[in-house]
UniProtKB/Swiss-Prot annotation:
Record InterPro entries: NADH_UbQ_OxRdtase_su1/FPO (IPR001694), NADH_UbQ_OxRdtase_su1_CS (IPR018086)
TM region positions: 3-23, 69-89, 102-122, 144-164, 171-191, 222-242, 253-273, 294-314
Name of the protein this chain belongs to: NADH-ubiquinone oxidoreductase chain 1
Catalytic activity, as annotated: a ubiquinone + NADH + 5 H(+)(in) = a ubiquinol + NAD(+) + 4 H(+)(out)
Source organism of the structure: Murina suilla
Stated family: Belongs to the complex I subunit 1 family.
Locations listed in the record: Mitochondrion inner membrane
Role, per record: Core subunit of the mitochondrial membrane respiratory chain NADH dehydrogenase (Complex I) which catalyzes electron transfer from NADH through the respiratory chain, using ubiquinone as an electron acceptor. Essential for the catalytic activity and assembly of complex I.
Keyword Transport annotated: yes
Lineage: Eukaryota, Metazoa, Chordata, Craniata, Vertebrata
A Pfam family this chain is assigned to: NADHdh
GO cellular component: mitochondrial inner membrane
Highest taxon in the source lineage: Eukaryota
Keywords: Electron transport, Membrane, Mitochondrion, Mitochondrion inner membrane, NAD, Respiratory chain, Translocase, Transmembrane, Transmembrane helix, Transport, Ubiquinone
Bilayer disposition of the protein: Multi-pass membrane protein
């Protein structure tokens, strides 16, 4: 039974990722006044299937000087971690109802850094290594603010369980009292998932393609899937933390529909940002975090510690 549940989560996520790639190409196309993919199937709807067949039937080439074991483990682990991060998300009921689900997600997103680092190192290519080091520095840096923002929100929530966020937001979205945190969170998720304007890991002008420069075919597709699964997961998490959908246990389907529509809108917003903004310079990226976001989030964290005590007494102990 558990295996069926697991498959019922993995298959839709992979399908969502496949069609997100199509949506991205369509959105970018229309924003640049062109059609995007429109040959394979009606309106190009079968393009993701064609892409998958093409990538997985290609020969998985490996550089002679690479470390073969790590070279294959890195993309596999990247996708495994990306899919595992979905398990504690309440939609409206999580696959694994953990007491520390928020910490679990943070820990897994930190582990995802290793896959990038290993792939860059195992490729034995200078470009890949520089791209990987950039990615690691960026991801680790932005995780600091993500953790502090999560801590601030959990002080209002009273526990590390994501399921209780729906109860917390029954009357008001947390977006409204803590909108500065929401803005910083959204920008940090962009940086955490290596999306434009923070896609410095894939700086074509200086690094050819970033940490996955030596990958082709299947392993490259696994990295691609992991990246997009992370994007949708981060947006789902944003919805759970800031725009909690109303959950009525009589009709849980309503929660799912509400949650899915909001996640889709945020994902489309990610694509819109990619089409609109140029890439940051690396020092600007780090400056934004360490000099702007970190002091602000620390102050906001202190504010969220003080606020419940000032207004109501000690925070809820659930």
């Amino acid at each position: 039974m558990y295996l069926i549940n697991l498959l019922a989560m993995i298959v839709p996520v992979l399908l969502a990722v496949a069609f997100l790639t199509l949506l991205e190409r369509k959105v970018l196309g229309y924003m640049q006044l062109r059609k995007g993919p429109n040959i394979v199937g009606p309106y190009g709807l079968l393009q993701p299937i064609a892409d998958a067949v093409k990538l997985f039937t290609k020969e998985p080439l490996q550089p002679l000087t690479s470390s073969p074991m790590l070279f294959i483990i890195a993309p596999t682990l990247a996708l495994t971690l990306a899919l595992t991060m979905w398990t504690p998300l309440p939609m409206p009921y999580p696959l694994m109802n953990m007491n520390l689900s928020m910490l679990f997600i943070l820990a897994l997103s930190s582990l995802a850094v290793y896959t990038i680092m290993w792939s860059g190192w195992a490729s034995n290519s200078k470009y890949a290594l520089i791209g990987a080091l950039r990615a690691v520095a960026q991801t680790i840096s932005y995780e600091v603010t993500l953790a502090i923002i999560i801590l601030s929100l959990l002080l209002m929530n009273g526990s590390f369980t994501l399921l209780s966020m729906t109860t917390t937001q029954e009357y008001i979205w947390l977006l409204i009292p803590s909108w500065p945190l929401a803005m910083m969170w959204f920008i940090s998720t962009l940086a955490e998932t290596n999306r434009a304007p923070f896609d410095l890991t894939e700086g074509e002008s200086e690094l050819v393609s970033g940490f996955n420069v030596e990958y082709a075919g299947g392993p490259f597709a696994l990295f691609f899937l992991a990246e997009y699964a992370n994007i949708i997961m981060m947006n789902a998490l944003t919805i759970i933390l800031f725009l909690g959908a109303y959950h009525n246990s009589m009709v849980p389907e309503l929660y799912t529909i509400n949650f899915t529509i909001k996640t889709l809108l945020f994902t489309a917003f990610f694509l819109w940002i990619r089409a609109s903004y140029p890439r940051f310079r690396y020092d600007q990226l780090m400056h934004l975090l360490w000099k702007n976001f970190l002091p602000l989030t620390l102050v906001m964290c202190m504010w969220h510690v003080a606020l419940p005590i000032m207004l109501a007494g000690i925070p809820p102990q659930t």
